[in-house]
Amino acid sequence: XSNSGDLVDAVVPYMGESIS
């Protein structure tokens, strides 16, 4: 993701949408 987890996407792009 890149849809939801902006901050998270930076470190865990594969969980960007999962974490939120």
Curated annotation (Swiss-Prot):
It catalyses: N(6)-[(R)-dihydrolipoyl]-L-lysyl-[protein] + succinyl-CoA = N(6)-[(R)-S(8)-succinyldihydrolipoyl]-L-lysyl-[protein] + CoA. Binds 1 lipoyl cofactor covalently. GO terms for biological process: L-lysine catabolic process to acetyl-CoA via saccharopine; tricarboxylic acid cycle. Keywords: Acyltransferase, Lipoyl, Membrane, Mitochondrion, Transferase, Tricarboxylic acid cycle. Its EC number is 2.3.1.61. Pathway: Amino-acid degradation; L-lysine degradation via saccharopine pathway; glutaryl-CoA from L-lysine: step 6/6. Its cofactor is (R)-lipoate. It is an enzyme of class 2 (transferase). GO terms for cellular component: mitochondrial membrane. It is found in: Mitochondrion membrane. GO terms for molecular function: dihydrolipoyllysine-residue succinyltransferase activity. Belongs to the 2-oxoacid dehydrogenase family. The 2-oxoglutarate dehydrogenase complex catalyzes the overall conversion of 2-oxoglutarate to succinyl-CoA and CO(2). It contains multiple copies of three enzymatic components: 2-oxoglutarate dehydrogenase (E1), dihydrolipoamide succinyltransferase (E2) and lipoamide dehydrogenase (E3). Forms a 24-polypeptide structural core with octahedral symmetry. This is Dihydrolipoamide-residue succinyltransferase component of 2-oxoglutarate dehydrogenase complex. It comes from Solanum tuberosum.
